C-alpha cells in the first residue's frame, strides 16, 4: 500500500503516534487510507450539502474495508462573484485546487481518493489533481439544483440575470424582480441548467471518472446519497484492481467527452477545462478537433439556457447514459473505455433507454446535425475563439456590424445599462483574458443584460474573456491571442466592421493588411490591472485560453 510509507514498520512509530492522535486504532491504521477531498462550504449553494455527501462516501469506504480521512479544498461561487472584481478569482482557483490535492495526497501518502466537488472550476480542478496524483480516484458531485417555479414556468439563475436587464430596460418592475429572486434558486445544488458546473459533472460520467448518474441525479434526492455510498465502495474496488485516473482518462475518453459535449450543448467553459484536463493526462489536444467532431456529432439536447428544459428533465429522460446509448447507435463513441465501475462504457450503458425523446432527441432526428459548440478562426482570432452555437438565435449565426470597444467588463456593463448599444452593434470586451484580466472573467452580466433588453437578436459580443454556461446569444469568447498578449482584439477600434459567420467558423475584422500592420506598429497594451498578490503571479504564468489557460 502507498500508505505504508507513513505507517509500516518500527521506523514509522512516530507517524503512527500522530495517526493515533486522530483517534485511529491499529486496525484502522492497517487498512487502506482513503482521502475524501471535499469542497464543502457555506457560500456556494452547490456545496452546502457536501458534508452529507462526505458522510455517505465515508460509510461506503468503511463498508468496503477502508479508513476514510476527509481533507478540504476551496471553492468560489461564480454566480455570487459575477460582475465585480471578485470574478477574477474564479478560474484561477482551478489551479489552486489541483495543486492542493497534489500536495495533500502526496504528503500524506493516501492510497486512493474520493473527490467531492460540484460547481464550475472545482470539478476540473479536482480531476486535474487526481490525474497528477494518479491513485485510484472517483468523482462524486453534490448534484444539480431543481429549477425554480414562477407563474407556472420553470426558471433558473439565467432568468435572474436577464431579469436585471429587463428591469433596467423598464420592461419589468421591482416587485416582479423581487418575486423572481425569491424562487429562482429553490434548493441546494449546482445551478439547474446545462451551465458550467452541470456540464462538467455530466462530462465526468463520459470521461469515466464518475459513476453513472453523477451528472443528473438532483442534489435533494436520496438517490444522490446512495450514489455517494456507492462511490466510496467503488474506490475500494478500484484500489483492489489497481485502476487509476490515467487508465481511465486518455485520448479515447477525452474524445468521448468532446463528442458528448457537442450532443449536450454544454457550456463553452467545458472546452477550456477539457483542454486543461487533457494536458494533465498527457493528451495533446488541438482546438481544431472540436469542429471536426461537431460536424460528426448531432446536438441531441437543448437545455437551459438554450431552452426552458433543465437538468432534472434530463435526469427523468434517462440521464447521460441514455444520451450516450443514443449516440452509440451511430458508433459515435468509443465504448471500450474503462470507467470507475471497473466496466467499460459499453457495459455501463447497456440496456439504458431514453424515456423522453423531447429532452434527448433520437439520433436520426436531432435538434441539429452539428454539435452545440463551435471554434471560430480568422484574423481576429488566429488561435481560435469559442461559441455555444446551440444557444445562438438562427438570425445571429451570420452577422456583420460596427465594433464598440471596451477595455473592461465594467465599462461595457455601464454602456449597456445606459442604453448606449444599438441594434446591429458588436460589443468588444478586451483585456479580460487569462493574462489581461487577469483571471478571464465571465461576461454573464453583459450577455444577460443584452438578452433582458431584447437585443439578443441583433447584438453580438466578442471577448478574450469567458462566458458563464448560463449565457445565451451570439456570445463569442476565448478570443486568442488575447489583447494583453498583443492579439488582434487589442487593435480593434470603434466602428471597425466585425464579420461573424458561425456556420463557416469565421471571425474577422474587415481591415486591410496595411491598416493592420500600421496599428501593430503603434500598439501598446494597457498597464497590468493587478500588480501584486496571487493574480499578479498567475498573470505571469498562465497560458492562452486556446491551451486551456493552464499554468506553465
Curated annotation (Swiss-Prot):
Which metal ions or organic cofactors does this protein require, according to UniProt? [2Fe-2S] cluster; Mg(2+)
Query: What is this enzyme's EC?
Result: 4.2.1.9
Q: What does the record give as the reaction this protein catalyses?
A: (2R)-2,3-dihydroxy-3-methylbutanoate = 3-methyl-2-oxobutanoate + H2O; (2R,3R)-2,3-dihydroxy-3-methylpentanoate = (S)-3-methyl-2-oxopentanoate + H2O
Q: Which UniProt keywords apply?
A: 2Fe-2S, Amino-acid biosynthesis, Branched-chain amino acid biosynthesis, Iron, Iron-sulfur, Lyase, Magnesium, Metal-binding
Q: Name one GO biological process term.
A: isoleucine biosynthetic process
- Return the cofactor note field: Binds 1 [2Fe-2S] cluster per subunit. This cluster acts as a Lewis acid cofactor.
One GO CC annotation: cytosol
Q: Name one GO molecular function term.
A: dihydroxy-acid dehydratase activity
Enzyme category, top tier:
lyase
Q: Which residues form the active site?
A: 468
The modified positions for N6-carboxylysine read: 121
For whether the record's keyword set contains Cytoplasm, the answer is no
Pathway involvement of the protein, from the record: Amino-acid biosynthesis; L-isoleucine biosynthesis; L-isoleucine from 2-oxobutanoate: step 3/4; Amino-acid biosynthesis; L-valine biosynthesis; L-valine from pyruvate: step 3/4
Record function comment: Functions in the biosynthesis of branched-chain amino acids. Catalyzes the dehydration of (2R,3R)-2,3-dihydroxy-3-methylpentanoate (2,3-dihydroxy-3-methylvalerate) into 2-oxo-3-methylpentanoate (2-oxo-3-methylvalerate) and of (2R)-2,3-dihydroxy-3-methylbutanoate (2,3-dihydroxyisovalerate) into 2-oxo-3-methylbutanoate (2-oxoisovalerate), the penultimate precursor to L-isoleucine and L-valine, respectively.
Family as reported in the entry's similarity comment: Belongs to the IlvD/Edd family.
What NCBIfam families does the record tag this protein with? ilvD, PRK00911.1
Protein's name in the database: Dihydroxy-acid dehydratase
Amino acid at each position: 500500500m502507498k500508505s505504508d510509507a507513513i505507517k509500516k514498520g518500527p521506523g514509522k512509530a512516530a507517524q503512527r503516534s500522530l495517526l493515533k492522535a486522530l483517534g485511529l486504532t491499529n486496525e484502522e491504521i492497517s487498512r487502506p487510507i482513503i482521502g475524501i477531498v471535499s469542497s464543502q462550504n457555506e457560500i456556494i449553494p452547490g456545496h452546502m450539502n457536501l458534508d452529507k455527501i462526505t458522510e455517505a462516501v465515508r460509510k461506503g469506504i468503511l463498508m468496503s474495508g477502508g479508513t476514510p480521512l476527509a481533507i478540504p479544498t476551496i471553492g468560489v461561487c461564480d454566480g455570487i462573484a459575477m460582475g465585480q472584481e471578485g470574478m477574477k478569482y474564479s478560474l484561477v482557483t482551478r489551479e489552486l485546487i489541483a495543486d492542493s490535492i497534489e500536495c495533500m495526497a502526496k504528503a500524506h501518502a493516501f492510497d486512493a481518493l474520493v473527490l467531492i466537488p460540484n460547481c464550475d472550476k472545482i470539478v476540473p480542478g479536482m480531476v486535474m489533481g487526481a490525474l497528477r496524483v494518479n491513485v485510484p480516484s472517483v468523482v462524486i458531485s453534490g448534484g444539480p439544483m431543481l429549477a425554480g417555479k414562477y407563474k407556472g414556468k420553470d426558471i433558473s439563475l439565467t432568468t435572474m440575470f436577464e431579469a436585471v436587464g429587463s428591469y433596467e430596460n423598464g420592461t419589468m418592475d421591482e416587485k416582479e424582480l423581487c418575486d423572481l429572486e425569491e424562487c429562482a434558486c429553490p434548493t441546494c445544488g449546482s445551478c439547474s441548467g446545462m451551465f458550467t458546473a452541470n456540464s462538467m459533472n455530466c462530462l465526468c460520467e463520459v470521461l469515466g471518472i464518475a459513476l453513472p448518474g453523477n451528472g443528473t441525479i438532483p442534489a435533494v434526492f436520496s438517490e444522490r446519497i446512495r450514489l455517494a455510498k456507492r462511490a466510496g465502495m467503488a474506490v475500494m474496488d478500484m484500489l483492489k484492481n489497481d485502476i487509476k485516473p490515467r487508465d481511465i482518462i486518455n485520448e479515447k475518453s477525452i474524445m468521448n467527452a468532446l463528442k458528448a459535449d457537442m450532443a449536450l450543448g454544454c457550456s463553452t467553459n467545458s472546452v477550456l477545462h477539457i483542454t486543461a484536463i487533457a494536458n494533465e493526462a498527457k493528451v495533446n489536444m488541438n482546438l481544431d478537433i472540436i469542429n471536426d467532431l461537431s460536424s460528426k456529432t448531432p446536438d441531441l439536447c437543448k437545455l437551459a439556457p438554450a431552452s426552458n428544459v433543465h437538468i432534472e428533465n434530463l435526469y427523468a429522460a434517462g440521464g447521460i447514459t441514455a444520451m450516450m446509448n443514443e449516440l452509440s447507435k451511430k458508433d459515435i463513441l468509443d465504448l471500450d473505455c474503462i470507467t470507475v465501475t471497473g466496466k467499460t462504457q459499453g457495459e455501463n450503458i447497456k440496456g439504458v433507454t431514453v424515456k423522453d425523446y423531447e429532452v434527448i432527441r433520437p439520433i436520426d432526428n436531432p435538434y441539429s446535425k452539428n454539435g452545440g459548440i463551435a471554434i471560430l478562426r480568422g484574423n481576429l482570432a488566429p488561435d481560435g475563439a469559442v461559441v455555444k452555437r446551440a444557444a445562438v438565435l438562427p438570425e445571429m449565426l451570420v452577422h456583420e456590424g460596427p465594433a464598440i470597444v471596451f477595455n473592461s467588463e465594467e465599462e461595457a456593463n455601464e454602456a449597456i445599462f445606459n442604453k448606449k448599444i444599438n441594434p446591429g452593434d458588436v460589443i468588444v470586451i478586451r483585456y479580460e483574458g487569462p493574462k489581461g484580466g487577469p483571471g478571464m472573467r465571465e461576461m454573464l452580466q453583459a450577455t444577460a443584460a443584452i438578452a433582458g433588453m431584447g437585443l439578443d437578436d441583433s447584438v453580438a459580443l466578442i471577448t478574450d474573456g469567458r462566458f458563464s454556461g448560463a449565457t445565451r446569444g451570439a456570445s463569442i469568447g476565448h478570443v486568442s491571442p488575447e489583447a494583453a498578449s498583443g492579439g488582434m482584439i487589442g487593435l480593434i477600434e470603434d466602428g471597425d466592421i466585425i464579420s461573424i459567420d458561425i456556420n463557416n467558423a469565421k471571425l474577422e475584422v474587415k481591415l486591410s493588411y496595411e491598416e493592420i500592420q500600421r496599428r501593430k506598429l503603434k500598439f501598446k497594451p494597457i498597464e497590468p490591472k493587478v500588480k501584486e498578490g496571487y493574480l499578479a503571479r498567475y498573470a505571469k504564468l498562465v497560458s492562452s485560453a486556446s491551451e486551456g489557460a493552464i499554468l506553465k
